Amino acid sequence: MSNLTCKALAAAAVSLLEERPLDKITVRDITDRCGLTRNTFYYHFQDIYDLLGYI
């Protein structure tokens, strides 16, 4: 697991969580925020809840 990629995804998720509730955040929102693809997200995490566990 690339530490920089995971940190970028985590930072994007935290940033979005400051703006809106979790149920209004999609994987695409997270990947768009940090400039990565959905495939990259799913390479590192199973779903948003897996990412939250990382955070």
Language-model features, listed with the residues they occupy:
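The alpha-helix within a helix-turn-helix
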Residues: T31
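An amphipathic alpha-helix adjacent to DNA-recognition modules
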Residues: N3-V14, E18, D23-V27, G35, ...
